[in-house]
């Protein structure tokens, strides 16, 4: 492969950065406008999933842990059977059992409740977990909050030595909720 031609073609179509590894060794690395931060929007969800993977590996949480055990102080007064059965795994697969995608971008400024964890757990769990996919921000958000609570730090601090440094990502920032918790469903820059 001609890396110079590939790099020129990538730049021509608006690629923001390029890193090529061969047999575990970086053989080409180029960024255009390195100082500019860009929101990766919902790709943030994948980074939050990495945080959960590290936390599982470190014994901080389990994918089979039920949400009622993970968030006991945040539960609504009435706990449905579906909420009772929902697990951390269901957060990551977006098969939580909630009928609608919640905590989406246009919705967030409209919420009067500042504690989005309590709000997210109060939305109806209309379906049995792991039976229906509904794209949402609730799952990745709650998964990120759980990692933050168990690790004792925000997601950027948790992921910097585990992921960001290894990828050469410097000074990442992340959107936060009204109470200052990282919004793991989006807003990673």
Per-range role (PLM):
Residues 107-129, 139:
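Amphipathic alpha-helical interface segments
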Residues 43-49, 85, 135-140, 188:
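Short alpha-helical patches at coil-to-helix transitions and adjacent helical residues
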Residues 15-29, 112-120, 164-175:
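Acidic-glycine-rich active-site phosphate/pyrophosphate-binding loop
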Residues 24, 39-64, 91, 143-147:
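Active-site SXXK
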Residues 58-98, 122, 150-186:
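Active-site helix/loop module of the DD-peptidase/beta-lactamase fold
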Residues 36, 40, 79-82, 128-135, ...:
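Solvent-exposed loop and edge beta-strand segments that line ligand/cofactor-binding
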Residues 33, 124-128, 139-141, 177-184:
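Flexible glycine/proline-enriched surface loops and loop-helix/loop-strand junctions
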Residues 3-34, 63:
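A short, well-structured edge-of-sheet supersecondary motif
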């Amino acid at each position: 492969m001609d890396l110079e031609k590939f790099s020129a073609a990538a730049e021509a179509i608006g690629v923001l950065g390029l890193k090529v590894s061969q047999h575990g060794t970086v053989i080409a690395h180029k960024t255009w406008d390195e100082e500019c931060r860009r929101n990766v929007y919902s790709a943030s969800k994948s980074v939050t999933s990495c945080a959960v993977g590290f936390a599982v590996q470190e014994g901080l949480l389990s994918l089979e842990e039920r949400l009622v055990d993970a968030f006991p102080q945040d539960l609504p007064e009435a706990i449905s059977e579906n909420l009772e059965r929902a697990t951390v795994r269901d957060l990551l697969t977006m098969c939580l059992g909630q009928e609608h995608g919640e905590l989406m971008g246009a919705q967030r400024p409209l919420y009067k409740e500042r504690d989005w964890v309590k709000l997210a757990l109060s939305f109806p769990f209309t379906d049995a977990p792991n039976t229906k996919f509904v794209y949402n921000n609730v799952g990745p958000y709650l998964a990120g909050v759980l990692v933050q609570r168990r690790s004792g730090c925000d997601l950027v601090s948790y992921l910097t030595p585990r992921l960001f440094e290894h990828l050469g990502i410097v000074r990442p920032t992340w959107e936060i909720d009204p109470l200052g918790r990282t919004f793991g469903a989006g807003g990673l820059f």
